[in-house]
Amino acid sequence: MKEIQPSTYIKYNNNNMLSSERLIAKDPRIDPRVRRFNQKLIELLEPVEQKMKEQNIHGLQDIHLDPSLTRIETIKMMRKELATYGIFIYNEINKLPRDKVESIIGPLKEGEPIRLHSGYLPETREYDYLYTNEGLDVDNSQSFTSTIDNNIVKVSIIKPTTLKAPYPTVVYYHGGGMTQSSAFGPQYQRWFKTLARQGLCIIGVDFRNAGFADPANPTNPIAPFPAGANDCYAGLKWVYDNAEKLNVDRNRILIAGESGGGNLSISTALKAKEEGTMHMMSSGVYAMCPYIAGTWNGNEIWSDRLGISHKENFGIVLKIPIDNDPNAYVYGQKMYCSEDKTNWFNPKAWPGYATVEDLKDLPRMMISVNECDPLRDEGICFYRKLLKANVKAYCRTVLGTCHGGDSIVYDKCVPDVCLQTARDISQFARFNDHHLYDMKVNDAKL
């Protein structure tokens, strides 16, 4: 791929709204089904893009940030402005029925039977299971009161109806850069169901966002760091303390998340180390495409100290802001940690800045990265730092995928890829070191 030089960064970053889709559609590394889907998106959204150009609006950067407005008011203003130009048409595209998706990307693969803890669901195409509750117990009515600051946090609990108690459990933190989205959003409800069908109880913690509330949970309070991180730790503690009531197996609790949720998974582990409660995550941490450093200094990116993925994959789904880029206000330290710079490099806010000493004694950890993600190499660098700290760490790279492309992004295009990641998470959660060594011979079908 053509390398993006520092001198062209600003011009490139202010490119048209479909720059990411065009990069994906042309990138030979990316799964062809995803490429075809993005080509169709381009065709559908080019009229919207043209309207934006006529109004001289190229993206979030060009919408006036009135310094007299508060942070939240500014965000609301930007969302309203963008909605005028149909940006959120993506939400409608995301609801396409299977026949429409197949008309874009071609026939979906026939799926294997989806294995449960005991028995199988009927054979079908994985795509069908993105929408159904068949074989699942879905409880979106529960909440708990945080022992840290008394905030009331909602949780989504999904598990197979045939799963035998006590349940191997994943405490999941959703992505969205710690600033947006919700565990109750349709993309996460689909992902939780996919995970649950691998023999797991999934408990999604709907922590406070630092940016704005999601339509799926519009009353969720908004607050910068450490509010959301506190909710995540409190969620883990609530699950552990109420294990009997929830039928959770205390010896098989994994914390996991993708993107911003990957950040929160690692920061929760750091918080647990500080509190002396790492035993609560008995199966460890599974962090996917973790967004762990916010805004890097431009010299760091162009020096290759963080690898080459920031340059190689720049603009594919993510445009991580650097230096004084206005995007930093929207998606980086300023939004998550507010204007108070004291937390901009706090490892519990941004684990990428953790030292080897900070990481010592953390529980076992999987760092999963995507080949075509700008964050790929900093995730790999973090994995190597974990090894230096003598943490039992593992790393996997999912080829042909962009940021989050094996979980919530493009799950309708590549359900088989997402299913493979779900299976890996299940194995990591259900068979931690204790269970591997204590398995009975009859349980190991070798």
Question: Which residues does each predicted region cover?
Answer:
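Alpha/beta-hydrolase superfamily serine-hydrolase fold, recognizing
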Residues: 3-91, 100-101, 127-446
